[in-house]
Amino acid sequence: MARLVGLAMMALLVAAPARAQIDPRGALLERTGWDAITAGQGAAAAKAFREALAADPKNARLHLGAGLAATLERRDEDAKDEFERALVLDAKLTRARALLGEVLYRLGDLSEAIRTYETLTADSPEDRDAQATLERWRREADLHDRMQRAIGSHFTVSFEGPAEAELAAQALESLDRAYWRIGPLLGVYPSDPIPVVLYTSEQFRDITRSPSWAAGAYDGTIRVPMRGALDKGTELDRVLAHEFTHALIRTLASRNVPTWLNEGLATALETGDLDWAQQQIREAGAAAPLRALQSGFGRFTGDQAKVAYATSAIVVRRMLDEAGGVAVANLLRDLGEGADFNSAFLHRMQRSFEEFW
Ligand SMILES: [Zn+2]
């Protein structure tokens, strides 16, 4: 028996290099693809895996790589297709199943995401993170099942009980005001109703896992913790306008948008008044360097976040003042289509970014 195992091992050891000899180019492409994933370079990874798959279309690992590349580029539908393909070829590729669940969740298909994680946790009972994610999603599904909905022409607002019905009606009115204020400014009018969910603070932290300073979140659904917003109508307007702007930005560009531009536009269009932002930067001594504001702000402490939002808002306010909302919207469209930031900026703002800021 030991000998047989030994022989089987030998066969495996021999098989790997033999395969590489048959297709060294494929092995090299795959290596390039994984290196690009590690470096966060979605486009380069997508290209490498696409070429590798052309020669070896039934390789589950290559489909996993192609899916990860698509995830990095925020092409969630493509990522879903690739992870599903990987799992058809190799049902035990648990990494693909974990990523498929995440992408389904991002696409708003909570029930399918839950089903995927039920299979994942049955296959890998030792995976505590997957178990915790599954439980969180189940709590979200239970909560959403319990919720009622207020339907407007551009938004649907979900809320938990009759006590929140009045607030939901106020939220709908506030969202409609934001729609007719910000839509014309950017020249964007989403046709499909945007889902909005009102949470308690605890539900909000649990479901979005946002930092404690966050007043709202947008991930395809506008999610807002209502406590506190209740007593102050202006705060409700501010938070909903901010998250609605994120929804507009998503319709213009689902990817490639630097965080300072995304958050800056949402913050600049909250109320229009940016005196607080100037004040914030004066107090901090300096604006935040934009290169530190390219990706998510979730890692910042409350004070760092304030300067990050203030800086972003002031930069985007200047863009709006100089070139107008439609030019900023066109810049976002170009970025979403994969354009290089500096060239797109020069084209739409009529001067180089370096000269601008
Ligand atoms: Zn935001």
What role is predicted for each listed range?
Residues T38-A39, L72-E73, R106, E140:
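Register position in tetratricopeptide repeats
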Residues N59, L93, D127-R128:
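Residue-level recognition of tetratricopeptide repeat
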Residues R146-P258, L269-A277, E283-A308, S312, ...:
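Juxtacatalytic substrate-recognition/specificity segment
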